[in-house]
Amino acid sequence: MKTFCGRANPTTGSLEWVEEDEDYDYHQEIARSRYADMLHDKDRNMKYYQGIRAAVSRVKGRGEKAIVLDIGTGTGLLSMMAASAGADFCYAVEVFKPMANAAVKIVEKNGFGDKIKVINKHSTEVTVGPDGDMQCRANILVTELFDTELIGEGALPTYEHAHKYLVQEGCEAVPHRATVYVQLVESKRMWSWNKLFPVHVEAEDGEKIIVSPSEMENCPGVPSVCDIQLNQMPSSDFTILSDVVTMFSVDFSKPVRSASTCYRAQLDPVKSGKAQIVLSWWDIDMDPSGTINCTMAPYWVKPMSAFQWRDHWMQCVYFLPKEEQVLQGEKVHLTACRDEYSVWYTLQKAREEDESKADARVESPVCRCQAHLLWNRPRFGELNDQNRTRQYIKSLMSVLRTDSVCLCISDGSLLPVLAHYLGAEQVFTLENSAVSCSVMKKFFKANHLEDKIKIVEARPELLTSSHLEEKKISVLVGEPFFTTSLLPWHNLYFWYARTAVTEHLASDVTVLPQSAALHMMIVEFQDLWRIRSPCGTCEGFDVQTMDDMIKNSLNFRESKEAEPHPLWEYPCKSLSNPQEVLLFDFRKTVPQHCLSTEGSVNLLRKGKSHGAVLWMEYHLTADISVSTGLMQISNEKGNCEWNPHCKQAVYFFSSVIESETLADVPTAVTYAIKFDTKTGEIAMDFKLL
């Protein structure tokens, strides 16, 4: 059965009704899941297996039957580990129906159908008793309910319920405990993801400084965790201010409380500096003695020889509400507060008067300035990138005249301020969301520009002459940046907006950027390929059914599409030269016909061709460009440096998805890329030769 779904098209800006198969949602969920990544996590799987064997052995050693409850079973892997370790019976709970169906097949295929019962329910709905889902309470609790923040997927309320209703008192738990660690650092780079720094503009009448509204300066930001591959953050980008300390632990073998609470740790700064960031990660002990340990610690804490790449568990960056000066040897107190699903931090000087406040509840951070709702963290980083801003200043200086009437089309951009300071006679900015309007009003007011720059709250196609005070636009500018964009080419919405406002443009209008180009390069990933690679067997268990399910869902939609990834976090090396494949001329309106290209790229280096990376370059003027992708190939090995503020598009080749073993190493890759100007979508196909 087909169903119609209303979707906003990020490239054309129009609302479209799309016919989708009724199974579309779950296919997309499977295709975009990290199941494969978890199955490839050898360290995790091995430690879980060791912990489960030890738990079953302890229960059997007491002369008891080993009854296992596995919550969030996924493929059934942990239940099969328990059954093969000698458990008498396992209850495997999985709420996602397609996954539960796959688990039933996998369990049967591996010969554990008589030892494992898959229950397709949320664990809080599972019943115990002669007529229940479980005959009796379990004495071994096995789960993998953790995310990068540990508790973000609801581990605490799930454990709390399980201890009350599903497991015996004094049960064994795998993992046995989790411990959260923190470290205080100063980092201009990471702080730039949460605060807007002053922007210096050299204008003809002297230096101007663009400042943030005080409301934004004092705003703690949004409560959502910033999870990144901290192992890709060079040590030169942060200064360690404290040793690593334990913030809190959770013992999963005892009743767990999910109610909000706070923890406090004393830190002795090892260096003076600005405390801005709390870096955090966790580890899990699979057994009570802590000998079987799985850790997320970053490279400067544990030796790289013990490093296991994983994408389903990373490390956390927390922004303190405001930066605090700390002095070496002068103690400070770090407070971690948590609710059921998230954690946040505050820092206090360790003075006596603060002791009485130790138990005071600290409210979860809430963005009141709205800028953190408009701009995500990479966008803050982009706006703070002085080199990038200089390119826009340089290009604006070359096109603006004293009589220029300027219109800016981008979401929450600083370009209108730059255009005004650089001499435009009049500046209009098109903001088509209430949030961006509100933020920009505050911004202009803080810089005494509320009477100098006019905000037009309208969609481009609804722009009227009266909005523009009956003036024609001589300079149309955009970064372009739009909050709805996920893939690099979605910002081509600027082209569609430019087309929609054509009647308001002067005949000799200057458009900046004047054009954009789609670029492409073939790469070998160090690790990212694993998220799309089949597993086959995992710790000796056949999970081919899972591979087939993911492949089927990828074929349903995703495998012929590129997906966004921030490649500064995922190292790769180039196997081909970067190549421009499509050009979009913003000086002209969007054409009626499709834009398409075919060709081939030669592979210059040996390596596994995992996929193609695609990105946009914007030609601001004839000789000034900004890239959203490749910044440079840093050495002869082909290691790449990527724009850290943007996600690049990755198209994985079928050789990754289907785990093909190529008899001959390919020497070239052919491509066919088509941009449908009506839908704004890019279709692509690649073949290895």
Swiss-Prot record:
Listed Pfam families: PrmA, PRMT_C
Example GO biological process: methylation
Recorded catalytic activity of this chain's protein: L-arginyl-[protein] + S-adenosyl-L-methionine = N(omega)-methyl-L-arginyl-[protein] + S-adenosyl-L-homocysteine + H(+)
Organism field: Gallus gallus (Chicken)
GO molecular function, one term: protein-arginine omega-N monomethyltransferase activity
Annotated protein name in UniProt: Protein arginine N-methyltransferase 7
Location of this chain's protein in the cell: Cytoplasm, Cytosol; Nucleus
PANTHER family per the UniProt record, alphabetical: PROTEIN ARGININE N-METHYLTRANSFERASE (PTHR11006), PROTEIN ARGININE N-METHYLTRANSFERASE 7 (PTHR11006:SF4)
Origin: domain of life: Eukaryota
Gene Ontology, cellular component aspect: cytosol; nucleus
Keywords of the record: Chromatin regulator, Cytoplasm, Differentiation, Methyltransferase, Nucleus, Repeat, S-adenosyl-L-methionine, Transcription, Transcription regulation, Transferase
SAM-dependent MTase PRMT-type domain boundaries: 14-344, 359-685
Function noted in UniProt: Arginine methyltransferase that can both catalyze the formation of omega-N monomethylarginine (MMA) and symmetrical dimethylarginine (sDMA), with a preference for the formation of MMA. Specifically mediates the symmetrical dimethylation of arginine residues in the small nuclear ribonucleoproteins Sm D1 (SNRPD1) and Sm D3 (SNRPD3); such methylation being required for the assembly and biogenesis of snRNP core particles. Specifically mediates the symmetric dimethylation of histone H4 'Arg-3' to form H4R3me2s.
Enzyme class, broadest EC rank: transferase
Enzyme Commission number(s) of this protein: 2.1.1.321
Similarity comment: Belongs to the class I-like SAM-binding methyltransferase superfamily. Protein arginine N-methyltransferase family. PRMT7 subfamily.
Active site residues according to the UniProt entry: 144, 153
Main localization category: cytoplasm
